[in-house]
Structure formats: C-alpha cells, structure tokens
Amino acid sequence: MVPVKTFMIPFDKVIAVDRHISVRRAAKIMKDTGIGSVLVTWDRVIIGIVTDTDICRRLVGMGLDADQTSVEHVMTSPVIKIDENKTIRDANAMMAREHIRHLGVTRDGNLVGMISVRDMVTFVSNLPKKWILGKGGTRILEQIYGRP
C-alpha cells in the first residue's frame, strides 16, 4: 500500500502565515500560489490552518470583512494530522470522517508535511493507465488503497 509520505508536500514547501494577518492577505497568498490552505502560526508555532472552505463558511458566510478579520478568527484548530506511514486509504477515510480536505503529515509526532484531496487525486491520476486499466489493475489498486 502507498504511504502518504509518497505524495505529501514537504514542510519546507508549505506556506505559513502569522495569526494576525488579514483573511484578504491570506486569500491573496493562496490565490497567487495556487493552493487551498495556509498554516497559521503564533511565534513560529503552528496553531491552525485556514482553508478556502474556512474562508467561505466563516468569513463570507458570516458577513465578515476580509480586511478587518484576522486568519486566527476563521482558522480550523488544531490541524488534524496523520502519520507519514499511513496509507492513501487511511488518509481518505480520515478526511471523510472529519469532513476536511487537508491533513498535516507527521513523523514521530512532528509535522513534516501536508496532503490534500488534490494531492491524492493528482497522485492517482498520474499513475500509468496500463497499471490501472491493464491486466493487473485490480492488484495495483489494492496496493494503493488496501483491501476493503
């Protein structure tokens, strides 16, 4: 089975913002970099995550001002995490259970990366079609997702 560390975004590539920046500024960073979330920090300690869904539900949905509202007020906290050796199936199940699309990835309890639904879809869609559609396709899918 494929562990999430295979397709995670390493921590040094993950974007983090200070808890005091405005939601508008965070949204612009997300738009400009083509990502759906940023981690939120307080004195370089990760205290949460802001996703595009958080912005829709907790800012737009509540009629708040994006320039006057800090990311701390719309973030999800704590970041829900999964061990790097868990499988893509485990990550999918956790995201479904928690109704989220982003997970922190840990090694020995320390955050080492992030994964999103988009990362999982990209990973699976980039597998050679002959692996998925060919004679051994079922075996390959079992290796990726595990047995039901």
What name fits each language-model region?
Residues 1-13, 51-81, 87-96, 116-148:
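Tandem CBS (Bateman) regulatory domains
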Residues 21-26, 37-42, 56-62:
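Short, functional N-terminal and low-complexity linear motifs
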